[in-house]
Regions:
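Amphipathic alpha-helical packing segments from all-alpha helical-bundle domains
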Residues: 95, 106, 111, 115, ...
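Amphipathic alpha-helical linker/stalk segments
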Residues: 70-101, 106-108, 112, 146, ...
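Basic, helix-initiating cap at the start of DNA-binding domains
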Residues: 1-37, 41-53, 60-61, 66-67
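C-terminal peripheral helix-coil segments that are non-catalytic and often amphipathic
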Residues: 1-11, 99, 103, 144, ...
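Membrane-interface starts of transmembrane alpha-helices
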Residues: 160, 164-168
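Hydrophobic/aromatic residues within well-ordered alpha-helical segments
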Residues: 22, 65, 72, 76, ...
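Conserved hydrophobic residue
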Residues: 39-40, 130, 159
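Short, structured helix-loop boundary elements
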Residues: 23-24, 44, 66, 70, ...
């Protein structure tokens, strides 16, 4: 059904799809297969069949299955504007962090992302490379974008000097709360918007208690000095 829909869309555009359209079709096919069968269970032949292109075309765009997997994750991050150049930078600290955290929670609560977390966790023990790829291409890439924002706020004197990598992981964990765990376990299908907004607001406020410049007597002598994974 999915393949037929893609072929119909290509026919409506007339003639053979262009290179970018083929790359997009390959990404969509790979995403569907990775979610259904995992990285280890998905072959490039299957991706080619699902996308309605030749295997040679798949390899022409993505040199390996690992490269294709990374591209799928990267495309999801970019969909939510979660790359360094896509994050807002001209707001005050609270407004900026609220905007960043809203995007972060929209990303990690996206059904496809939740499903991919489950796939990776299920395969991590038997195929640890899959977990490494996901961690590097997803959480670490997202962390890098947020670290740049936190570094800018610190350079502007709006946050105390800190290790931005460590602080980014802290901010993510404050955002997760118990919402993401419930999603992963299938205890909830979606998060009510008001609950999501409340969680984001609390996370930002708690983060600013730790890091906002000009807060007296809050015991920050050691805050942010531990080194986080890069």
């Amino acid at each position: 059904m999915v393949k037929q829909a893609r072929e119909a869309q290509a026919a409506q555009r007339g003639g053979r799809p262009k290179s970018e359209e083929k790359a997009r079709a390959i990404l969509e096919a790979a995403k569907d297969l990775f979610l259904a069968q995992g990285l280890h269970g998905t072959s490039m032949d299957a991706v080619a069949r699902e996308a309605g292109v030749s295997k040679q075309t798949v390899y022409g765009h993505y040199e390996s299955k690992e490269t294709l997997f990374r591209a799928c994750i990267r495309s999801k991050i970019e969909e939510f504007g979660f790359q360094e150049e896509g994050l807002p930078g001209s707001l005050g600290p609270r407004a900026l962090l609220l905007a960043v955290c809203r995007r972060f929670m929209a990303l990690v609560c996206d059904p496809d992302v939740v499903a991919m977390y489950r796939v990776v966790i299920a395969e991590a023990v038997s195929h640890p490379r899959i977990a490494e790829l996901f961690f590097e291409s997803g959480p670490v890439a997202t962390k890098s974008a947020v670290s740049a924002v936190l570094g800018e706020l610190s350079a502007r004197g709006e946050l105390r000097p800190h290790d931005p990598d460590y602080a980014s992981w802290q901010l993510f964990n404050l955002c997760f709360g118990h919402i993401h765990t419930r999603l992963l376990f299938g205890l909830i299908r979606e998060v009510p918007p008001e609950e999501l907004e409340q969680q984001v607001g609390r996370a930002v406020d708690d983060f600013l208690v730790l890091y906002e410049a000009g807060r007296p007597g809050d015991g920050t002598a050691g805050v942010g000095r531990s080194k986080a994974p890069k």
